């Protein structure tokens, strides 16, 4: 039996997460493995009920679970709070830290039936199937920072630093993932300017001998941003530091036609966190307009990376593909000639395909 902490969160979270849970229940029946789901508060919902974005009991539940499934946190309701107390900061960052999650995995895979939904031309975007491995615990976001008045006027600074050990663990993970895919790794840095990037590049060079079957290329981050829209199918696995990864993964998210299609995993410790890449979308919350597929695909990543159930994960991905191929679309993907469905109906369609497939 696997224990899964379920954190719906805010906005559309309580609508999309149950659909992923139901898909996992269908997997459970299909393969005969039991999942135990335990729900808890996080984010703005936790602030409203408990006065804190990450209650101790939620954190303890996550620690005692085998994996965590998260919906989304945040929204305008809590934007008046001090930045350090807002759901996005006060829930996600400490949760990642406490669980020891140092790597974020963001796949960008374009289903054939969604090629026309991409903002890029068909001939450019066809064949896109990449994953960005982003370092989560170092870099600018966690370095020393300050804003102050000086004799010369107001100034501010942020500090970027990395240890070789931090780089080694994320790079080895990326090599391992590349070895399981198409054996091509692109390491993204800014080694022509940044000292941290030069250490990053040197570390990649030192480690690549451990993975002789993987082809490695180094690419400056500005060039990578250009190549992602010029020829995205050239990429297999991209590994990069925190800030660059944050930007590039959001850029890659538009390739698939909707951010509502993009899952993610944060891994590194004993317990991994799985969540869709999109936010809480409070403007459509409670209206059955949200796309649950990113959350369902995040559940598939859970099966693959936490439970080593690769075949079950592939079955979910294939079920999603068949639903899309039949023309069913949530509002974010809808175009004339397709069949408009709501959140729960889309989840039901995936479950039906999974059970019949």
UniProtKB/Swiss-Prot annotation:
Keyword Acetylation part of the UniProt annotation: no
Residues given in the record as substrate binding sites: 96, 106, 134, 222
Highest taxon of the lineage: Bacteria
One of the Pfam families matching this protein, by short name: Iso_dh
GO cellular component, one term: cytosol
Residues of the site described as Important for catalysis: 141, 190
Pathway: Amino-acid biosynthesis; L-leucine biosynthesis; L-leucine from 3-methyl-2-oxobutanoate: step 3/4
Cofactor note (record): Binds 1 Mg(2+) or Mn(2+) ion per subunit.
GO BP annotations, alphabetical order: L-leucine biosynthetic process
Binding positions (NAD(+)): 75-88, 279-291
Entry EC no(s): 1.1.1.85
InterPro entries referenced in this protein's UniProt entry, alphabetically: IsoCit/isopropylmalate_DH_CS, IsoPropMal-DH-like_dom, Isopropylmalate_DH
GO MF annotation list: 3-isopropylmalate dehydrogenase activity; magnesium ion binding; NAD binding
Signal peptide: none
Compartments, as annotated in UniProt: Cytoplasm
Cofactor: Mg(2+); Mn(2+)
Keywords from the UniProt entry: Amino-acid biosynthesis, Branched-chain amino acid biosynthesis, Cytoplasm, Leucine biosynthesis, Magnesium, Manganese, Metal-binding, NAD, Oxidoreductase
Binding residues annotated for Mg(2+), in chain numbering: 222, 246, 250
UniProt catalytic activity: (2R,3S)-3-isopropylmalate + NAD(+) = 4-methyl-2-oxopentanoate + CO2 + NADH
Function as written in the Swiss-Prot or TrEMBL entry: Catalyzes the oxidation of 3-carboxy-2-hydroxy-4-methylpentanoate (3-isopropylmalate) to 3-carboxy-4-methyl-2-oxopentanoate. The product decarboxylates to 4-methyl-2 oxopentanoate.
Subunit structure: Homodimer.
Similarity field: Belongs to the isocitrate and isopropylmalate dehydrogenases family. LeuB type 1 subfamily.
Protein name: 3-isopropylmalate dehydrogenase
Source organism: Moorella thermoacetica (strain ATCC 39073 / JCM 9320)
Originating gene: leuB
């Amino acid at each position: 039996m696997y224990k899964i902490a379920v954190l719906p969160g805010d906005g559309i979270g309580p609508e999309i997460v149950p659909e992923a849970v139901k898909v996992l229940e269908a997997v459970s029946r299909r393969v005969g493995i039991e999942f135990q789901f335990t729900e808890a508060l996080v984010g703005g919902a936790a602030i409203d009920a408990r006065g804190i974005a990450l209650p101790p009991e939620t954190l303890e539940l996550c620690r005692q679970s085998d994996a965590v499934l998260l919906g989304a946190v945040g929204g305008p309701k809590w934007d008046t709070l001090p930045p350090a107390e807002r759901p996005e900061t006060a829930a996600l960052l400490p949760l990642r830290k406490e669980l020891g999650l140092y790597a974020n995995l963001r796949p960008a895979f374009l289903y054939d039936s969604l090629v026309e939904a991409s903002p890029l031309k068909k001939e450019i975007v066809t064949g896109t199937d990449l994953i960005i491995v982003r370092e989560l615990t170092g870099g600018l976001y966690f370095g020393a920072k300050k804003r102050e008045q000086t004799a010369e006027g107001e100034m501010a600074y942020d500090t970027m630093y990395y240890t070789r050990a931090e780089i080694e663990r994320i790079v080895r993970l990326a090599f391992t993932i590349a070895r399981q895919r198409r054996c091509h790794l692109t390491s993204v840095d800014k080694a022509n300017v940044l000292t941290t990037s030069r250490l990053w590049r040197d570390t990649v060079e030192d480690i690549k001998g451990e993975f002789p079957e993987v082809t490695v290329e180094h690419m400056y981050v500005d060039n990578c941003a250009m190549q992602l829209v010029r020829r995205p199918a050239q990429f297999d696995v991209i590994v990069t530091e925190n800030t660059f990864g944050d930007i590039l993964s959001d850029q890659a998210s538009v390739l698939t036609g909707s951010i509502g299609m993009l899952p993610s995993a944060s891994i590194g410790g004993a317990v991994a966190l799985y969540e869709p890449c999109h936010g809480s979308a409070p403007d459509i919350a409670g209206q059955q307009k949200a796309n649950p597929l990113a959350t369902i695909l995040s559940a598939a990543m859970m099966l693959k990376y936490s439970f080593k159930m690769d075949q079950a994960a592939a079955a979910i991905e294939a079920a999603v593909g068949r639903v899309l191929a039949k023309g069913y679309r949530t509002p974010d993907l809808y175009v004339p000639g397709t069949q408009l469905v709501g959140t729960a109906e889309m989840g039901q369609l995936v479950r039906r395909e999974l059970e019949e497939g």
